[in-house]
Amino acid sequence: MNIPQELKYTKDHEWVKIDGDTVTIGVTDFAQGELGDIVYVEVETLDETLDKEEVFGTVEAVKTVSDLYMPVSGEIIEFNESLEDEPEKVNEDPYGEGWMIKIKLSDTSELEDLLSADEYKEVVGS
């Protein structure tokens, strides 16, 4: 299982890449593996400001639909529109082309609540 050291994680299986006050968010390799083949990604919260742990979208797989949760508070400034036509990118490259949203961070102190790669490995039993 791929768990890049440079990223931060949540117990809800989202990953977070921090670049100043812009944060890129997606689902982890573990999450995409558990979901199975992803057929649809829906994010209707573009340009909205959401609080940590609010739902920002859904991901639909062959067998299930799962909510996507904000790992930190912020304004959603970008959605990876390529996922509309190619949702399988989430399965194929969850940490690269399968990213989901970018947000403008509201509260940098919330970053301290995120898990390191090693802490996330403990969550998934890796």
Swiss-Prot record:
Its cofactor is (R)-lipoate. The keyword Oxidoreductase does not apply. Binds 1 lipoyl cofactor covalently. GO terms for biological process: glycine decarboxylation via glycine cleavage system. The keyword Zinc does not apply. The modification N6-lipoyllysine is found at K63. Residues 22-104 form the Lipoyl-binding domain. GO terms for cellular component: cytosol; glycine cleavage complex. InterPro entries: 2-oxoA_DH_lipoyl-BS, Biotin_lipoyl, GCV_H, GCV_H/Fam206, GCV_H_sub, Single_hybrid_motif. CDD domains: GCS_H (cd06848). Keywords: Lipoyl. Pfam families: GCV_H (PF01597). It comes from the Bacteria. The glycine cleavage system catalyzes the degradation of glycine. The H protein shuttles the methylamine group of glycine from the P protein to the T protein. The glycine cleavage system is composed of four proteins: P, T, L and H. Belongs to the GcvH family. HAMAP family: GcvH. This is Glycine cleavage system H protein. It comes from Christiangramia forsetii (strain DSM 17595 / CGMCC 1.15422 / KT0803) (Gramella forsetii). The gene is gcvH.
